[in-house]
């Protein structure tokens, strides 16, 4: 009966500015502050900081690293998310953030710790997607589910002022298999 209904579908969506086209992966505090000021001056209501804000051991300066390492890059954002959220508030707009928790790069702390969390066919070499390093996590695995939930829970728990999450899905499915599920539970 309610299939196809959009929650709050009768409400006007906020006018937003997403940082991606402005800076791509070169996220930094001055650029984010300037973009927030600009969208507020134009009457916008929401600023979304896109890809490029995270990474510790492996910094997100190209798209071949850091997916899975959802830690603020303090070299790019020395004052953390708190400062950006306050900047949005001072400009009278809301703050949003980009994540892609189902994805991982082979060059990431997450993959170093849990290579078995990537979708893969046992006995076959991993196939990489975008940038030659991207893979999807095996969401059949309860540990992966907990990890993904934890990303969102951690972000919103520490920063309840985050008003919007852009949950992206850029990685194509290359590895059709699970190291978690037994073979009889897989279709191949």
Regions found by a protein language model. Name each.
Residues 14-20, 129-133:
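Short glycine/proline-rich turn/loop motifs
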Residues 9:
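Active-site-proximal segment of RNA-dependent polymerases
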Residues 14, 36, 51, 58, ...:
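A sequence-level detector of short, solvent-exposed, charge-rich linear segments
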Residues 12-16, 45-46, 92-96, 162-166:
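Structural preference for beta-strand elements that scaffold enzyme active sites
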Residues 73-80, 86-90, 112-188:
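Active-site neighborhood of glycoside hydrolase catalytic domains
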Residues 21-112, 119, 146-150:
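Aromatic- and glycine-enriched glycan-recognition loops and surfaces
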Residues 1-6:
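Beta-strand-rich recognition/accessory modules
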């Amino acid at each position: 009966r309610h299939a196809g209904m959009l929650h709050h579908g009768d409400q006007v969506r906020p006018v937003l500015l997403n940082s991606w086209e402005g800076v791509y992966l070169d996220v930094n505090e001055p650029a984010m502050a300037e973009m927030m000021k600009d969208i507020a001056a134009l009457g916008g209501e929401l600023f979304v900081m896109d890809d490029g804000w995270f990474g510790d051991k492996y910094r997100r300066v190209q798209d071949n690293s850091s997916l899975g390492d959802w830690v603020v890059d303090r070299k790019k954002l020395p004052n953390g998310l708190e400062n950006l959220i306050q900047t949005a508030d001072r400009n009278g707009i809301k703050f949003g953030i980009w994540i892609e928790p189902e994805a991982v790069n082979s060059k990431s702390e997450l993959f170093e710790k849990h290579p078995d969390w990537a979708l893969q066919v046992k006995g076959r070499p991993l196939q990489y997607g975008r940038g030659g390093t991207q893979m999807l996590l095996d969401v059949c695995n309860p540990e992966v589910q907990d990890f993904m939930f934890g990303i969102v829970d951690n972000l919103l728990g520490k920063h309840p002022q985050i008003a919007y999450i852009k949950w992206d899905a850029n990685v194509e499915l290359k590895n059709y298999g699970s190291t978690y599920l037994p073979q009889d539970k897989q279709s191949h």
